[in-house]
Amino acid sequence: MSNIKKYCIFTTIYNVGFTFCTGAIMQTFLIQAGFSAEQVYLLNSLMQIMQVAMMLVLTFLSGKIKRVKTVTSISHLSLCILTVVFLMGAINPESIKRGYVIAVFITAGISYVGVGLYTILSYCLPYYTIDMKDYGKMTGVSAAIAGGASFLMSLAYSLLLSKFSYMKITSTFFIISILCFILSSIVCASMREKIMETNEEEREKNDVTAVFKNKNTYILLIPNFTRGLSIGIFNVIATIAISTSILNETTSSYVNVILQIATFAGNMFFAFAYKKLSTKNLLLFATIGACVSFPLSLELGVAGFFCCFTVASFFRFVIDTAIPVIVTEIIPKEQIGPYTSIRMLVFTGAQAVATLIITPLNAAVGYTGVLIFATVMLFICGVMYYAVAKSVKQSIGNQK
């Protein structure tokens, strides 16, 4: 089996597992377990902070990791720790007390160190395992397949919730998550690594200081930070919708279904359109689409929420796929490891900030104002990435 097929398989399996122990499902479970909305926001912030800490370390070490495939496969297992704790609470809800809350926070912190490791190395792994000319299409197709699989699982989860006990079904899917992480780790470890030959010039470019000499590293700090603020708010939309009584524990499960549909549709759209429209044009188009639809999510009732959120999610996942691809067009391949650490460090740190400011921002301008703030931040990101990519392309053209 080719590495591209294995890449699609392990990313699909990993994303299915990730779906059922994070995001809307995690938020709903925690609220059902007795966590307050503020505790959920704080937990999300902690998880992002631990990712940031690991990314900070990888800024200096990612280029020195020799066994990228092996370390990546091990990092797949990190979320098993947190999911086991979730499973214990779902199997025996009566045992959930203050000690359980503390256990969730501790294991979440530990698990998200591993998630931070996986986040960075997943961008480095393709350089060691595939032909990078296939990277754009492979990214779109693999993400679409992962979204389709996660959609089917999320749909099954939502349908089962309407017929059986919430905690019973949720505990079953926590078990599925654990199995998915183990299997994805095995598939990743089975990939064949290319022999990487590095000459003296490439070694100099691969020096961790080289990325700090690249002016685009600093210019892109701004859009990476503003995107993090926007996505940080986007990621807790289920909690926001429950807090405003638009959704409840049953209807909130459909948020996850929407996300998986949007993942599939957005990534398939990107995979077949990015060469015709160019990555930067797709990014700008998706940014405008998300900015128009997202602020309306809380204003039109339940049906309006699902409609606007579906559209916003579609464009959000086009953006999520476009940015890693456009980065390969802006940043030299020798600097991609350290740069990705910096990019994800800023992006994830901003997500942590976002979950901390939601409560005071809501007190000042209401939840609709919070969504408008997220929209403005996303717009800044899209416009700046477009401008930098256009500038780099023109610069390369002038050199020729």
Question: What function would you assign to each model-found segment?
Answer:
Residues 1, 194-222:
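Juxtamembrane intracellular "pre-TM" segments in multi-pass secondary transporters
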Residues 1-53, 216-257:
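Helix-loop boundary and gating motifs at the non-cytosolic
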Residues 18, 85-90, 180-192, 367, ...:
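Multi-pass alpha-helical transporter architecture, strongest
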Residues 37-38, 130-142, 249, 333-343:
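Loop-to-transmembrane helix entry/capping segments in MFS-fold secondary transporters
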Residues 54-67, 161, 266-278, 362-363:
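Helix-to-loop junctions at the C-terminal end of transmembrane segments
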Residues 70-86, 281-295, 375:
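Structural signature of the two symmetry-related core transmembrane helices
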Residues 115-130, 318-331:
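Intracellular juxtamembrane helix-capping segments at the cytosolic ends
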Residues 280-320:
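C-terminal transmembrane helical hairpin of 12-TM major facilitator-type secondary transporters
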